[in-house]
Structures are given as structure tokens and as C-alpha cells.
A protein has these predicted regions:
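Inter-helical junctions in multi-pass inner-membrane proteins, predominant
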Residues: 1-7, 13, 157-161, 188-227, ...
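Loop-to-helix entry region at the N-terminal start of transmembrane alpha-helices
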Residues: 2-13, 56-57, 130-151, 209-211, ...
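Cytosolic-side transmembrane-helix boundaries in multi-pass membrane proteins
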Residues: 111, 171-178, 182-185, 256-286
Length: 286
């Protein structure tokens, strides 16, 4: 049963990374690698609120989500929006996003150091036991957060006005403006929501495991792989791909050791990019 719990935990983290990354991609139509920063910022924000402000874990999590959402929106307005206004290609936006990620990742390392830090010690964390399996309270939060985000994003994409506006902006931003859609408002909301979800993932991972300056990309990469395998425009298949990827990843760790999990992820990513290299520089809407 513990293997099932481990799979659920890994799948929840992958789902959150995949769906938050997807939200930006389907609207802005480029690979936003700087989204990994939101995961790192969320982890360090939770650590800072927990240690410096003596906030309880619940408020540390909420504060990290709010702060990361604001930071992601600000980075879009300052760095990416001017490039998009000038008609920058998806490749240019990808390179700019990668540069932003590297600059701020090293900035985090300069401020907090390279060493891994623990937000919440395991000795202080409540642990629940179910038929021989164990889940910490943070792991329960992570699973609940992933389920909630998946349901809300699925319903929003299918039934809400914002979901229809998002699809219109993704299809043709200029035509959307003609029809009265505030494109900038939609894009800001997308980056706000995606960054907040990424920050929540970082905060929960930091409470459950540890934080480090490069943690964002380590957690984003499996999400990107699940997104590509499941299909960018089908949320339910992204969730299914995340569960399948987590299951195989757990099996790899169990039988071969944790050192092989990254090799597995990179192998799947390489195979997909080998078959569809155009995905990195823009893809046609299905």
C-alpha cells in the first residue's frame, strides 16, 4: 500500500507541474521554462514565512501561493509582455524564459545558498497510517491540492467564460481584441493562476522534502513530459499520463534505485522530441 501512496504523491506533484505549465503554453504558445522559478520561489517563500514570521504551515502555504502568483504576474509584465507586444517568435520567448530562469535561479542561490533546506521537520509533522501505509499531513494536502486544481481547471476550460476567452486568445489574440476580449487581462490571469499553482507545489514539496535553488526544474521536467505524452489540449489525458508516469517512476525507484528516475524521465522526453521536434518552437492548435 505504501507504493500506492508513493505513486499518488508523485502523480500529484507531476499533475500540478503539468497543468500549471499547460495553462501558460496554451495561451502564450511558447515553452515557459521560467515557470520552474515559481516552484522554487514557492518553496523558499514557505520556508521564509515558516522560519522568519513564525507562521504555521497552513498560513505559510497560503502566503507562498499569493506571493508566487504576484511574482509570476510581475515577471510576465516586465520581461515577457514587451517581447510578445513586439511580435517575438516562440523560439525567442523560449530563450528569454530560459535566461530569466537561469538568472533568478542563481540569484536565489546567492541569497539563500546552495544547500538544501527543510521547511518543516518530519518529527513535528503529523503522520496518518492506513493499512500499513503512511501519509504525512503535507502529503495529504498535496494530493487534495492536485485533485482540486485538476477539477477546477477542467471545469474552467469546458464551461467558464474565462476558459472560452483563454481559448480565443490562444487561437488568435488580434481577432480576440476585435471581438472585445481584453487580451492583456486574460494573459495576466493565466500567469497569476499558473504561478500560484506552481508556488503551491513548491511550498508543499518544500514542507514534505526539502528546498534548493534548482528544485523548480527538477519538478517541472516530469510535468512537461506528462503534458507532452498526455496531449497538451486534453486535461484528463494529462492527468492520466501523470499517474502512469508516476507509476513507472515509482517502479524504477523501487527496483533500480532513485538514481535511475531522472534517466527515465529524460529518455521519455528525448523520444518525444525526436518524434516531434517542432513542439519546442510552436505547435498548431488542434
Amino acid at each position: 500500500l505504501q507504493l500506492v501512496f508513493n505513486t499518488l504523491i508523485a502523480a500529484s506533484a507531476i499533475v500540478l507541474a503539468a497543468l500549471s505549465f499547460r495553462l501558460v503554453y496554451v495561451t502564450a504558445r511558447f515553452f515557459h521554462f521560467a515557470h520552474a522559478l515559481t516552484i522554487s520561489i514557492g518553496g523558499y517563500a514557505a520556508w521564509s514565512f515558516f522560519n522568519y514570521c513564525a507562521a504555521n504551515p497552513y498560513w505559510a502555504f497560503l502566503s507562498a501561493v499569493i506571493l508566487t502568483g504576484a511574482a509570476g504576474t510581475l515577471s510576465f509584465m516586465v520581461f515577457l509582455r514587451p517581447l510578445m507586444t513586439k511580435g517575438a517568435s516562440p523560439l525567442v520567448l523560449l530563450l528569454a524564459s530560459l535566461a530569466i530562469h537561469l538568472i533568478f535561479q542563481h540569484t536565489i542561490a546567492l541569497i539563500f545558498g546552495e544547500d538544501a533546506r527543510s521547511v518543516w521537520s518530519l518529527e513535528q509533522m503529523p503522520v496518518y497510517s492506513f493499512a500499513g501505509g503512511h501519509l504525512t499531513v503535507v502529503q495529504c494536502w498535496l494530493i487534495a491540492f492536485a485533485v482540486g486544481v485538476s477539477v477546477l481547471m477542467g471545469c474552467s476550460a469546458s464551461f467558464s467564460i474565462f476558459g472560452k476567452q483563454q481559448a480565443a486568445v490562444a487561437e488568435h489574440s488580434e481577432l480576440s481584441t476585435i471581438f472585445g476580449i481584453d487580451v492583456l487581462s486574460v494573459q495576466m490571469k493565466v500567469f497569476l493562476i499558473a504561478s500560484a499553482v506552481g508556488g503551491g507545489l513548491g511550498a508543499l514539496v518544500g514542507m514534505d522534502l526539502s528546498i534548493s535553488p534548482g528544485m523548480g526544474f527538477d519538478w517541472l521536467l516530469p510535468g512537461v513530459v506528462a503534458l507532452l505524452v498526455g496531449g497538451i489540449y486534453r486535461i484528463r489525458y494529462v492527468v492520466l499520463a501523470s499517474v502512469m508516469l508516476a507509476s513507472v517512476r515509482t517502479a524504477v525507484i523501487w527496483y533500480l534505485g532513485s538514481m535511475w528516475q531522472d534517466i527515465f524521465i529524460y529518455s521519455v522526453l528525448f523520444l518525444y522530441l525526436f518524434l516531434r521536434p517542432e513542439i519546442l518552437v510552436g505547435d498548431e492548435m488542434q
